[in-house]
Amino acid sequence: MKRNYQLVFLSAFLLWFAWPPIPFSSPILLIALVPILLATENIIGAQAKKKGKLIFRTAFLCFFAWNTASIYWVFNSLDSAMPTWVAALISLIPFGLGAVLMTFAFWLYYRLRLITSKVWSYAGLICFWIGYEYLHQSWDLAFPWMNLGNGFAATHQLVQWYEYTGVYGGTLWVLLSNILFFEIWQALKAGTLKMNKTRLILPTIILVTLPVLISLFIYFTHTEKSNPANIVVVQPNIGPYKKFGSMPPSEQINRLIHLSDSVGQSNTEYFIWPETAISQGTEEKTFREDESFKTIQNFLNEYKNANLISGIESFSIYDSAATVTARYNKNSGIYFDVFNAAVSIENSGTLQFYHKSKLVPGVEQTPFSNALSFLKPAFAAFGGATGSYGKQDEPSVFYSQSGIGSAPVICYESIWGEYVADYIKKDAQFIAIITNDGWWGNTSGKDQHLHYAKLRAIETRRWVARSANTGISAFINQRGDIVQRSKWWVQGALKQDINLNEELSFYVRFGDYIARGGSIGSGVFALILIIALLKKRKF
């Protein structure tokens, strides 16, 4: 068993080392699962009882160690905002739950090995893993941060074909490569590698090199159609606790305007401010009466074509429980929703609102709110930083007076490829990501979040204009290159002429088809396992 534990921790180390933001290491993902496959094979071939439990335990150790090492910053961000025990409990969602789901994929692979061939078992492993990833981006505890395909974000030149497959193409590439390298290792140990050159070595070489060559060809031949628009992104560098505490909202607005003016041009189409840049809590119906709106309107009047996209903490009031998330105020007898939102303000005074749809489990929404409604008072006690926010069911596009369509993507939403693609289907010509990464501190979390934005640019072939409150703000072109970026925790503003794009990539048109296929496959293999179990028990 000691040997097996060494193997699983080796896999955990390789997975961590290959993960963003460590540069140039992502190809290691293509072999990182070989040690855990070896450990699993050792247990299957051993004279031991309760092999299933052993496989589950060893696999869980591997994936829990990898998840914790890669996204340790989740606890950091929560611990500073709530009691440590609550932060630790919520941190288990990304640390532990993801690891459990990954482990089940390996355990189900083991169960298939007992009743079918190795080849079909490998097919089952691929389907179970992809099915787990799709589940983990679709339910109330969604956290698709650790999907294997995301691991190539730091070396985006290698996965330009994500415009056809999305990140699930990367997941499939990683799983197939690891299986073939594992089979090569097994043949090498058995002394049969020479007689299996055609069956193993040639397919492995093709599988590893062909996607890279195709990607590099796309990368170096991709040209953007000229359709320029001048965009400004602003980084006010206001600490997240200062923002909601000691710094008056009017002072924050004045800083944002000053930074915007420092780089704005007569032809600037959009100024983009970060998540909750307008932070005082504003009723949407009466926003035009707010002093912040009037100040912003005066600023925009200085620019002929100017529009502003800004994060805003807003609320709506109802006479009845109009939404599932509506809260009731006993003193005033009204229902209301609070939103982590984006607002588009034109210099003509036209307003458009978008309510963040992908909410952070436990922090912005109570997971499975009907079943866990008893936790709502605990989350609500943390005020504006936590609790159940209102949301909208699908993305909506902001349109400027000149007809430009923009995708307002708020923070966490930027890790959903298909969700961002839905904006593009609705005629978004560029992506505006607004975020407040200061909660995480100076950790790898902020860097991972930035790198993932590169994947959205590739999938959709759209420029990304990224405004972060404390960093890192950036412009990313259609190939996923970071053209400009700010420093962490520094005030500033960036301007860039970007090329708007109206064409739809294959991935935008068809979305996560690989994930849906894998999910169907996992259902078929799960049914096979159930039938085999029923036959064994003679039910």
Task: Please provide the spans of the model-predicted regions.
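Membrane-embedded alpha-helical bundles of multi-pass enzymes
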Residues: 1-219, 442, 453-456, 468-470, ...
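Short, conserved active-site loops that position catalytic residues or coordinate cofactors/metal ions
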Residues: 22-35, 66-73, 235-237, 268-283, ...
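Generic structural signal for well-ordered alpha-helical scaffold segments
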Residues: 41, 109, 113, 182, ...
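Short glycine/proline- and acidic residue-enriched helix-loop micro-motifs
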Residues: 90-95, 238-244, 379
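Short glycine/proline-enriched turns and hinge-like loops at secondary-structure junctions
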Residues: 139-143, 225, 335-336, 487
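Membrane-interface segments at or immediately adjacent to transmembrane helices
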Residues: 154-160, 207-301
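Short acidic-aromatic active-site loops that bind/stabilize oxyanions
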Residues: 166, 170, 245-249, 409
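Solvent-exposed soluble domains appended to multi-pass membrane proteins
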Residues: 248, 273-539
